[in-house]
Amino acid sequence: MPTEANTYDPQRIESTAQHYWDSTHAFEVNEHSNKPKYYCLSMLPYPSGALHMGHVRNYTIGDVISRYKRMTGHNVLQPMGWDAFGLPAENAAIKNKVAPAQWTYKNIERMRTQLKSLGYAINWSREFATCQPDYYVHEQHMFTRLMRKGLAYRRNALVNWDPVDQTVLANEQVIDGRGWRSGAPVEKREIPQWFLRITDYAQELLDGLNTLDDWPEPVKTMQRNWIGRSEGLEIRFEVRDVDNNALEALRVFTTRPDTLFGVTFVSIAPEHPLALHAAKSNPGLAGLLTQMKQGGLSEAELKTQEKRGMDTGLKAIHPITNEQLPVWVANFVLMAYGTGAVMAVPGHDQRDQEFANKYGLPIRQVIALKEPKNQDESTWEPDVWRDWYADKTREFELINSAEFDGLDYQGAFEVLAERFERQGRGQRRVNYRLRDWGVSRQRYWGCPIPVIYCPTCGAVPVPENQLPVILPENVAFSGTGSPIKTDPEWRKTTCPECGGPAERETDTFDTFMESSWYYARYTSPNAREMLDKRANYWLPVDQYIGGIEHAILHLMYFRFYHKLMRDARLVDSDEPAINLLTQGMVIAETFYRKNPDGSKDWINPADVNVECDERGRITGATLISDGQPVLIGATEKMSKSKNNGVDPQIMVTKYGADTVRLFSMFAAPPEQSLEWNETGVEGMARFLRRLWTQVHHHASHGPATALDITALDTAQKAIRCKTHNTIARVEDDYGRRRSFNTAIAAVMELSNTLARFDDTTTQSHAVRQEALETMVLLLNPITPHTSHALWQTLGHPETLLEDLPFPKVDTTALVRETAILAVQINGKLRGTIEVATDAPREHIENNALTEPNTARFLEGLTVLKIIIVPGKIVNIVAR
């Protein structure tokens, strides 16, 4: 009859292990170790109030790596903190009528408890929240330093403005051109904002990607494209008004000066000074510019919006032909990119062509294939030239370009560059798509920007001895503006330079500021300065883990801020992380019912009964509450919008933390999407119960004697061989391949093999002991609670398994004295034989021919020849 001790009870097992880890401060580390350091970090969470399965997968991956590295002799740091500022707290404050700070700290308490219930090997003594003044004071100090160096500056920039709520909206708060809360049409408004000169580091950020050998190529490609280095010419176009008066010249950057003779108009942004000048005398244009101020600023909206424009009446003078080209305002030209002006070549640019077709503007072909394959390719048409451009192997030449006809791209580039530079009409330029980082946010729940505005002295950085500028937390928050803007006691101050009356900046930092350097603060969380010498012990991060959706913004700013800290002599390294792992999404089935208006009510999978075919595919579904059918949607990323999330806490309560951890590592490789499947979770629970039973059954037969590897029989040697083969596979899977699913599969194979092993002798018992100890240690990084308990069941004192060495391969155990060969007749498997690895051919042939099942199939046949693949197959050819 099973006793409490030998029954697999996850809650009891996990509580015991976690108490031991907490009481012994098992995962607190310092820099005074003779072991090599290893810093493993998963991206810090936003304290939304509840962990989701994406969190569980992310942090379990990090925990597996951390525990494995500690077992391989490393001094491992795995910290945790909270990315605590941000818009969701403001939205929750409006909805729940609580201060953002109160909501945030309550959520942190809940999520910390959830993380601890999963048994992560986190050094909690280094924990912080980015909304704490003793964290953001250093961020403010860094900003004032950047101001003095000229790397932080203020200029006007466009924002999304809600005229009803009187507030700035983030791009994601603009829905179909309207404010998410008020429903009012959103306006584009220019207001002063603070920027960091990330463009000063553009080339270094680009070059640094070549040193990141252990970052995924897709991430590096996305960053290269975002930085967007391009070489071209900046060309000067003289401009004249309707009365032929000269105006300020237009500067246009182009990577394709070879298309210059194809320019039929020039496009400028609605905010361009020339557009504003022309609108003064053109009411129709002024009205259009006002309309263009409405709508969001996101790239997605700008790409999908209808292309609109108007002729300003101004003329740009072609720098070679002197042709007067109309200057058009176009809503797809952005003032923030390049010079806010584009030379339009509708003959060889799809966007320009769509605009030209809409407004009846000329289209000219100025590039042709040197060697067209057929008549169709000789005839210029939009679809044809798009095909040309797609085929990078084809050669082109200029046509309809006066004396430049016949030149290829490079030839035309060099000739035109030399000509324009000589005439003072242009110059070679390297341009970057990357723009300076706008760090101002017109929101309350963020780090205050440490600047004072004085009528006499202008913008003055807050002196170091007056930092931090603390954000008041006990405020009434309505959502119609920031409380600190209307708090005169907080806002009004004195100028640190002249002593006169002044006001504080009421904008707060973009929350990417906090998440751009948090990893460094973990290394010295109690330092008086931003960082101390401990930072150079731990940095760079050895393993960073997070979703690929962070490839552009967070990971770019993460790299940029590290270089700022390096240049401030706070860190020695050039890059913040050596290895980056981007885990896949957690996806799940979706279910819904249609409403009369065509909308969908999404139903959580936990509320649905499903029917499956023999392959496990869902064929039908009904709602548990009423038994009526529901529709089956696609398998999609777990999200609130599709109501297909699974609460990790429910799973931990039902199955135990180790089962949840085991499934999240077994269901898919880390970089691939993981499809949540509770049937799979149940399978992992069965495996852990089976392992628990295996160990307890073995232990019930008493302690094992010492293993004598010189006195083993064939079966015992086979088990040892399987055990040490498993060690080799799992070590490679954990260490080099990061393939945790195959590591688990290897241990499962060993468990199944061991279940068929008959250990009636003391040596067999010792062989089984070694195999079980090996399985417990191999699984420890993934199922640490279960391993903690089973290690004691196997006769060892309670200890921290991470301080035990990871199992080592005994290469002598891998040498097999016998081999099992498949026996085939005419290519079909008919039996197996076991022979000595050095058996002569005649012995192998005789054993194969006399194997009972093989002999039965050979009756009445004549053996023509026997083919032996050493160590694998015996194929008998007969007829």
Curated annotation (Swiss-Prot):
- Top EC category: ligase
Keywords carried by this UniProt record: Aminoacyl-tRNA synthetase, ATP-binding, Cytoplasm, Ligase, Nucleotide-binding, Protein biosynthesis
Signal peptide span per the entry? none
UniProt-listed InterPro entries: aa-tRNA-synth_I_CS, aa-tRNA-synth_Ia, Leu-tRNA-ligase, Leu_tRNA-synth_edit, M/V/L/I-tRNA-synth_anticd-bd, Methionyl/Leucyl_tRNA_Synth, Rossmann-like_a/b/a_fold, tRNAsynth_Ia_anticodon-bd
Q: Which PROSITE patterns does the UniProt record give?
A: AA_TRNA_LIGASE_I (PS00178)
Map motif 'HIGH' region onto the chain: 45-55
* Localization in the cell: Cytoplasm
Gene coding for it: leuS
Q: Which reaction does it catalyse?
A: tRNA(Leu) + L-leucine + ATP = L-leucyl-tRNA(Leu) + AMP + diphosphate
A single cellular component GO annotation: cytosol
Q: Which organism is it from?
A: Xylella fastidiosa (strain Temecula1 / ATCC 700964)
What's this protein's family per the entry?
Belongs to the class-I aminoacyl-tRNA synthetase family.
Principal location class: cytoplasm
Q: Where is this motif: 'KMSKS' region?
A: 637-641
Q: One GO biological process from the UniProt record?
A: leucyl-tRNA aminoacylation
What would you give as a GO molecular function for this chain, any one?
Answer: leucine-tRNA ligase activity
Q: What is its EC number?
A: 6.1.1.4
Q: Which superkingdom, per the lineage?
A: Bacteria
Task: Name the chain's protein.
Answer: Leucine--tRNA ligase
List the SUPFAM superfamilies.
Answer: Anticodon-binding domain of a subclass of class I aminoacyl-tRNA synthetases (SSF47323), Nucleotidylyl transferase (SSF52374), ValRS/IleRS/LeuRS editing domain (SSF50677)
